Amino acid sequence: PTKMTRRTEPASSCSTGSLDCCNSSGDATDTSITTLLAGIGLPIGSVTGLVGVTCSPITGIGLGGSGCSSEALCCSNNSFKGLVALGCVPVDLSL
């Protein structure tokens, strides 16, 4: 199978969601992600795209720090108390 390269957007382009710093991320079809989603009551197949895992809001952009030492993502739905964030796109905090 061909591995898809993740597209990285400038952090400033995150206008549809929140900037989040996530410990890891994976495709919604990955076994570890589907297990996690099922564990919080989301039906398998109801979530698509990139999912952030163990996320917190990024603050301090433009204040001289990167604001995230893990994976910086722009996510459209982070209403699961930081456990997962849905609809994510990787972002570059330096752009």
UniProtKB/Swiss-Prot annotation:
Cell location: Secreted; Secreted, Cell wall
Keywords (A to Z) from UniProt: Cell wall, Disulfide bond, Glycoprotein, Secreted
One function term, GO molecular function aspect: structural constituent of cell wall
A Gene Ontology cellular-component term: extracellular region
CDD domains, A to Z: hydrophobin_I (cd23507)
Disulfide bonds: 14-74, 21-68, 22-55, 75-88
Record's function text: Aerial growth, conidiation, and dispersal of filamentous fungi in the environment rely upon a capability of their secreting small amphipathic proteins called hydrophobins (HPBs) with low sequence identity. Class I can self-assemble into an outermost layer of rodlet bundles on aerial cell surfaces, conferring cellular hydrophobicity that supports fungal growth, development and dispersal; whereas Class II form highly ordered films at water-air interfaces through intermolecular interactions but contribute nothing to the rodlet structure.
Family: Belongs to the fungal hydrophobin family.
SUBUNIT field: Self-assembles to form functional amyloid fibrils called rodlets. Self-assembly into fibrillar rodlets occurs spontaneously at hydrophobic:hydrophilic interfaces and the rodlets further associate laterally to form amphipathic monolayers.
The protein, known as: Class I hydrophobin 13
Source organism per UniProt: Pleurotus ostreatus (strain PC15) (Oyster mushroom)
Gene name in the database record: Hydph13
